[in-house]
């Protein structure tokens, strides 16, 4: 087992990474403040791991709250289901809410914990690669709004993140690839040697090699923890973690939540960010193509939806948390391994990026 730490003063917390951690109560019980525990999961994950976790928490008053699975349910109505469960069971301010699932469950359970009786204890047990390397670390919680993704939420840190890498053995291939999009992101924005490592090990990662997965998770979480410790509320450097997300969120919103997985939209969105960085002369076309090839090898889409127009993108991108005073800030690559957030770019470069023929670009790479 490896343990990292998110340094936030009195609110610092550990990230435990290893195989079989779900069965080790000593990693959880020090972070549970009362006798009441609510485990929030979904209809896919609960049959696999809910009973095991309940056994690990023997002696506690455990309340299971099982939600429907999918991004389409990351909304106010489903959030109310969590509150209904907590109130009906008379959970008090010393309850602990545990998120057992992927990013959707973590975001909603965390938001519920932030709101319930103005804040109760919260623990993250992420079961997908995407949630293990990204959404479980850093305290971002929330739900989607019909007009924009993650537009309603709060910063609310967990007291511990428990990453059992064995849970990836039950993860569908498509979900695994979606998680790799966020892993690749770290190499692009802050760790080019990691990008090289990923190029050498992407096949092992897709083959569920435990050693390779552990390295990828550790390096991703270490990068995320460092950034969050420096900028918890995304007033500066933390925004660079959103490489590809402005374009990607537009894709998710336009297509309908859940049609494209978040990681799939991030991959296509990052290709657009690479294209724009190349058009600005910040990275070469060869470096752009290097990123595209890695996403392809990870089994991810690299072409935005063909029916999305420039106006579609601009409409959705106008409703983005990085918009300040009406100006859209974008995360782009100054060079491979170094990201910046900026609103200083020629409008025509953004327009050219939105109308670029990505299908032809990918076909050219195949040739």
Swiss-Prot record:
The record ties this protein, via Pfam families, to:
DHQ_synthase, DHQS_C
Q: Which GO terms describe its biological process?
A: amino acid biosynthetic process; aromatic amino acid family biosynthetic process; chorismate biosynthetic process
A Gene Ontology cellular component where this protein is annotated is: cytoplasm
Source taxonomy lineage? Bacteria, Pseudomonadati, Pseudomonadota, Gammaproteobacteria, Pseudomonadales
Keywords on this record? Amino-acid biosynthesis, Aromatic amino acid biosynthesis, Cobalt, Cytoplasm, Lyase, Metal-binding, NAD, Nucleotide-binding, Zinc
Q: Which residues bind NAD(+)?
A: 69-74, 103-107, 127-128, 140, 149
* GO MF annotations, alphabetized: 3-dehydroquinate synthase activity; metal ion binding; nucleotide binding
Main location class: cytoplasm
Q: Which domain of life is it from?
A: Bacteria
Cofactor(s) in the UniProt record: Co(2+); Zn(2+); NAD(+)
The annotated pathway is: Metabolic intermediate biosynthesis; chorismate biosynthesis; chorismate from D-erythrose 4-phosphate and phosphoenolpyruvate: step 2/7
Asked whether the UniProt record includes Lipid biosynthesis among its keywords, one would answer: no
Q: What is this protein called?
A: 3-dehydroquinate synthase
Q: Which CDD domains match?
A: DHQS (cd08195)
Q: Into which family does the record put it?
A: Belongs to the sugar phosphate cyclases superfamily. Dehydroquinate synthase family.
Any note on cofactor binding? Binds 1 divalent metal cation per subunit. Can use either Co(2+) or Zn(2+).
- Organism of origin is Pseudomonas syringae pv. syringae (strain B728a)
Cell inner membrane as a keyword? no
Protein purpose? Catalyzes the conversion of 3-deoxy-D-arabino-heptulosonate 7-phosphate (DAHP) to dehydroquinate (DHQ).
